[in-house]
Swiss-Prot record:
Species per Swiss-Prot/TrEMBL record: Sulfurimonas denitrificans (strain ATCC 33889 / DSM 1251)
Protein name as it appears in the record: Histidine--tRNA ligase
Chain coiled-coil ranges: none
Source organism superkingdom: Bacteria
PANTHER family tied to this protein: HISTIDINE--TRNA LIGASE, MITOCHONDRIAL-RELATED, HISTIDYL-TRNA SYNTHETASE
UniProt key word Transferase: no
CDD domains documented for this protein: HisRS-like_core
Length: 403
């Protein structure tokens, strides 16, 4: 038997209902905030992610599905969504058009990770990206949108905030952090030893418990912010408080991608094990320029759909549509034509096996149809259809031409 690849799951039945429910809710709320849908290719040039996500990141260094295609192009399956949206933004010259551009997307991403609960090799993200607005009020709007989505889905969360500073306040902080980590060079893991050389701030994202305990004493970036970054972060906290969105400060929150600056945030859940992050994002004002566009302020977030599917509280399923069945072969020939007509306005589940009425009712109930409609010899003779409402249990016989 051929099975799906490890870490790449099928989505069907109840999972599909949860998946589509999430997409419906998230799309509705993103559109309320004035965002428009964008779709980018699954396959991109590898250079896109090396320049955006960062060559020092785990994603680029360890996790990408990368290969050389038949045209000798170095390509990879997208590991995240933001870089592709920024590439499209620059390629379509929207960075030169001025104004504010807001997009949302959803689709499959790919990372060669060790599969575990809440972490797959093919997974789906919903994300939003805003270009052209530098105000911290836009950062707050991103957080409020994510909060609205989670609340409508019935998902509880804790919101964690940090500021990663800017080009002015990051260099002196980086020097302080390097000095601190160097003092502990014999205690930290191999990944952190490598990160100190490539991107020191990423050591704070280490999941090694020993490293985490060491970094609790590390210098705090919030204590090194320039006046502008400090003012923006204070304003962000004020906006969230005014809108009754609770948050906690996490000074070690740096996100897993190299392009973030200033605002960084994560929504976490205590109900899905070690992979607790269910949404996250922040500001990335330099990324458009990194990808050869004009300097453009930008902010966004992404949500891991599979992780959220474990937490979604689904609305009670309602019976809907018609189950249509025949009691003999002559009736079976008739119901196909009747079903085709009815499908122009309603859901119709057609049963191709002839059964007695009792068995048709059982099958209709299992199908979650609201109505069971059956034709037998008497109905053929009278030109009628017998219909039962499976919710209120009422029955009626109507002319087939009126069905």
């Amino acid at each position: 038997m051929i099975s799906s690849l490890r870490g790449m799951n099928d989505i069907l039945s109840e999972d599909y209902e949860r998946f589509t429910h999430f997409i419906t809710v998230a799309t509705k709320i993103a559109q309320r905030y004035g965002f428009h849908f964008i779709e980018t290719p699954l396959l991109e040039e590898t250079a896109l992610f090396k320049r955006s996500v960062g060559e020092s990141s785990d994603i680029v260094g360890k996790e990408m599905y990368q290969f050389v295609d038949k045209g000798e192009n170095d390509v990879c399956l997208r590991p995240e969504g933001t870089a592709g949206v920024v590439r499209a933004f620059v390629q379509k010259k929207l960075d030169r058009a001025g104004g504010i551009h807001r997009f949302f997307y959803h689709g499959a991403m790919f990372r060669y990770e060790r599969p575990q609960k809440g972490r797959l090799r093919q997974f789906h993200q919903f994300g939003v990206e805003s270009f052209g607005e530098s105000s911290v009020y836009e950062d707050a709007s991103m957080i409020m949108m994510a909060s609205d989505i989670l609340k409508e889905l019935g998902i509880g969360y804790r919101l964690q905030l940090n500021s990663l500073g800017c080009n002015e306040c990051m260099p002196p902080y980086r020097e302080k952090l390097i000095n601190f980590v160097t003092k502990h060079k014999d205690e930290i893991c191999e990944d952190c030893t490598r990160r100190v050389e490539t991107n020191p701030i990423r050591v704070l994202d280490c999941k090694n418990e020993k490293c985490q305990s060491i970094y609790t004493e590390a210098p705090k970036l919030l204590n090194c912010l320039c006046s502008t970054c400090e003012s923006d972060f204070t304003t962000l906290k004020m906006i969230l408080k005014q809108n009754e969105i609770d948050f906690e400060i996490d000074t070690n929150l740096v996100r897993g991608l190299d392009y973030y600056s200033k605002t960084a945030f994560e929504f976490v859940s205590d109900n899905i094990g070690s992979q607790s992050a269910i949404a996250g994002g922040g500001r990335y004002d330099r990324l458009v320029e990194f990808l050869d566009g004009r300097p453009t302020p930008a902010v966004g977030f992404a949500m891991g759909i599979e992780r959220l599917m474990e937490l979604i509280i689904m609305p009670e399923a309602k019976k809907d549509g018609y189950y249509l069945g025949a009691m003999d072969d002559e009736a079976l020939d008739m119901i196909v034509k009747i079903a085709q007509k009815k499908r122009k306005s309603d859901i119709v589940i057609l049963e191709y096996k002839t059964k007695n009425l009792k068995n048709h009712l059982k099958a209709a109930d299992k199908s979650n149809a609201k109505y069971c409609a059956v034709i037998g010899s008497n109905e053929i003779k009278d030109g009628t259809i017998w219909v039962k409402n499976l919710e209120d249990k009422t029955e009626k016989t109507i002319l087939s031409e009126l069905f």
